Amino acid sequence: MPDPTIWQADDGRYYCIATSPRRSLVSDDLFNWRISDISPIDSSSWKAISSISHNFWAPDVTIVDGKRLMYITLYNSSEDSNIAVLQESSPCQFQYKGIITRGRETGIEDTIDPEVVTDPQTGKVWMFFGSVGGIHRVELSKDGLSIKEGAKYEHVAGLTVHQCPNRSQVFEGSYLHWHKGYWYLFVSSGFYGNHTYQLQVGRSKELTGQFLNREGKPMIEGYATPVLHSDEGDNFFGPGHCGEIFTASDGKEYIFYHCHVRDSHHPGGRPLFMSCIQWDKDEWPYIEGGKPI
């Protein structure tokens, strides 16, 4: 389940989809998951998006203006990458609504990994996205189905791969989480296929503000605070591209993400992981031990 997104449906159950979302997982309690019999994208929508690309990456499911939407990457190349939006048409099934941004039009390399959030203070809807061309932010229309007319794309985090070929300060997989007065921007850096891939974070008091790491250095310059990592040779390696944070029935908060398993029967796969996330005295997130278990 690479690049997962999780949401709680109207029936109270939790659903998870990931890159190439031809199936979904369902859970009653966040701890025990099974394969759902619901296809998350209807057949006509599969036909529509397949005419644009055969790579469907990193979905993000969220509620905008009272409707549940799915944002997803349609990837052909770093230059020809697009973000599409789908709307829930029946419980946990989504229908294609269109492309909302195209990398060929904006010039932003790797227009991928969308994360959409509504600012409760202003009601404005924002999309964060990107990878090797930097993490960008842009305002969406109120209904979340298009870029707001006249909106500007702003680079907010991460160096480009041209500035940092080893990707240690190149970010992707944005996820935003509100906690005690701050917006936390979780990102992943490194190469997703090896141990260098890791989860990091910065924060800002406003969605439109500057995101900083623990030392006060700007994420736009490639700085972030580590949350989860692995070392070369670890059985669980390359943790990152987190999904959402939820509070479970035990009262603890858990973060979801993908991770490689070295001794797996499917070594190329990236199963779904979850870890308990805690907050230190300065309200910075951490995971005990700093590694997936």
Model region roles, listed by residue range:
Residues M1-I293:
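Carbohydrate-active catalytic/glycan-binding domains of CAZyme proteins
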